[in-house]
């Protein structure tokens, strides 16, 4: 006849065996969702911008004159976002920084292992790289790219739980696409830099960086809001970027224009 102690031990063994069986059956363990990719790189979770020095080639949206109407339409997102249920997850960019990137350049954060100019050592000071690039840009024989028209492309929107808020764009016509690609290829040669995003590049305007992962309800609301915003912008017509510049920056809030490209 089994003793009380034997019964307790047997039950303990059975529970342990059952736990082992559940683990072996492939029931997934709860995994912590990684934070958005730019947290700890460009922004803190508190939504404060981090130091993120570098250089780039961008075209800012024109805020006055012929560009006022399209800029004002983009600002509708800036106006409406604070009332959204997901708003506190995002770090809003100042409208003065709104731009379309033509070609990304060198970032200080890439110094250790990221993309770097093939003709420069990784201990080359960023200030010297900026000066070198500026000298090369000024010496180019090619005329400036000039104004480029873009169409808002709602079908390219990404509204996942860790996706930043941006306006996806595409060149308004074949001629504009060819001009943009020729300029990009020329600048790739100038910088002697190859970045992963150079291939299949998606033109866009960044509006806000996600600083915390969206939950399911927030993601649904985010997807719905972005779809509405982009549909309205697309229906309003092209967005024209009047000119592009070589720029330097210390963080994602402001870009110093140095020379038109």
Language-model-detected regions and their locations in the chain:
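Histidine-dependent nucleotide/RNA phosphoesterase domain, centered on the 2H-phosphoesterase fold
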Residues: 32-261
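N-terminal secretory signal peptides
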Residues: 1-9, 20
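An N-terminally biased module of ancient metal coordination in phosphate/nucleic-acid-related enzymes
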Residues: 14-15, 100
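Basic side chains
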Residues: 11-14, 184
């Amino acid at each position: 006849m089994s003793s009380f102690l034997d019964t307790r031990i047997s039950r303990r063994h059975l529970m342990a065996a059952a736990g082992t069986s559940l683990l072996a059956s492939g029931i997934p363990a709860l995994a912590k969702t990684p934070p958005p990719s730019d947290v700890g790189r460009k922004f803190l979770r508190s939504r404060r911008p981090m130091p993120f020095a570098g250089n780039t080639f961008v075209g800012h949206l024109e805020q006055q004159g012929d560009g006022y109407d399209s800029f004002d339409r983009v600002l509708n997102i800036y106006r409406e976002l604070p009332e959204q249920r997901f708003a506190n997850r995002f770090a809003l960019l100042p409208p003065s920084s709104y731009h379309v990137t033509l070609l990304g350049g060198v970032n200080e954060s890439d110094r250790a292992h990221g993309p770097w100019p093939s003709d420069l050592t990784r201990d080359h000071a960023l200030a010297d790289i900026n000066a070198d690039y500026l000298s090369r840009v000024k010496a180019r024989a090619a005329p400036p790219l000039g104004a480029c028209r873009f169409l808002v492309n709602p079908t390219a929107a990404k509204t996942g739980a860790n996706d930043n808020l941006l306006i996806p764009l595409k060149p308004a016509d074949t001629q504009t696409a060819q001009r943009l690609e020729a300029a990009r290829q020329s600048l790739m040669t100038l910088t002697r830099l190859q970045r992963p995003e150079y291939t299949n590049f998606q033109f866009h305007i960044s509006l806000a960086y996600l600083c915390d992962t969206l939950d399911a309800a927030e993601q649904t609301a985010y997807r719905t809001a972005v779809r509405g915003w982009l549909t309205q912008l697309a229906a309003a017509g092209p967005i024209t970027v009047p000119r592009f510049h070589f720029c330097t920056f210390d963080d994602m809030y402001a870009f110093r224009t140095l020379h038109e490209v």
